[in-house]
Amino acid sequence: SIQTVFFGFLIATAVAVPLGIVSGLSPTANAAINPLVQVFKPVSPLAWLPIVTMVVSALYAGGEGGMSKSFLISAVTVTLCSLWPTLINTALGVASIDKDLVNVSRVLKLSPWKKITRLVLPSALPLIFTGLRLSLGVGWMVLIAAEMLSQNPGLGKFVWDEFQNGSSDSLARIMVAVLTIGIIGFLLDRVMYALQSLFTFSGKR
């Protein structure tokens, strides 16, 4: 489960951060991207899952040693549901940069790449990390439901199998799994918080 959620989370981060930077820097891009975010952000993972399943099934060409289809379905579903908090917070962080700093970058005639790496990212990093923490939490929650329905090996599939089993011990096993899910979710958030504190000047906000 942890492997799957990190795979989906990394893809979501790779998509959301660049889009958020573009959206934060350009009002025109924001006007185009923001409506799409508001349309797709509320969509339930249960709605995404059939679409993802059909697309992955049509394109899947895995073999021995490759990623399983159920793994890809779960990971892509995590990506689609978890990228929005990071995208929104990145755009907000970039758009909130001190205007004086922006003016200084213009006076110094910084190239777009230097402007992003030396001004935009350092200034927006606290909000970016806030988005990453939210995204990882959403991804972990979504993953459990995705594993149940896609039958990808993990905690979600374990809970579903025990529910289907219906033996006298199933309830106890499900409760242990639920506690495990909660504890892992808490630990994942603590890891992201530690990284936020390490790499930003306002990690305690």
Residue ranges and their predicted role:
Residues N89-G131, V159:
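Short cytoplasmic-facing helical segments at TM-TM junctions of multi-pass membrane proteins
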Residues F6, L10, A75-V76, I174-L179:
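Hydrophobic alpha-helical transmembrane segments
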Residues G131-F186:
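Non-cytoplasmic
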Residues V76, L80, P112-A146, V176, ...:
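Transmembrane alpha-helices
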Residues S1-I2, L25, A29-F40, L101, ...:
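Hydrophobic alpha-helical segments of integral membrane proteins
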Residues S1-V22:
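Transmembrane alpha-helix signature in integral membrane proteins
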Residues Q38-P85, L92-G93:
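Generic hydrophobic transmembrane alpha-helix motif, especially the helices
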Residues M175-R205:
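C-terminal transmembrane helix and the adjacent membrane-cytosol boundary/short C-terminal tail
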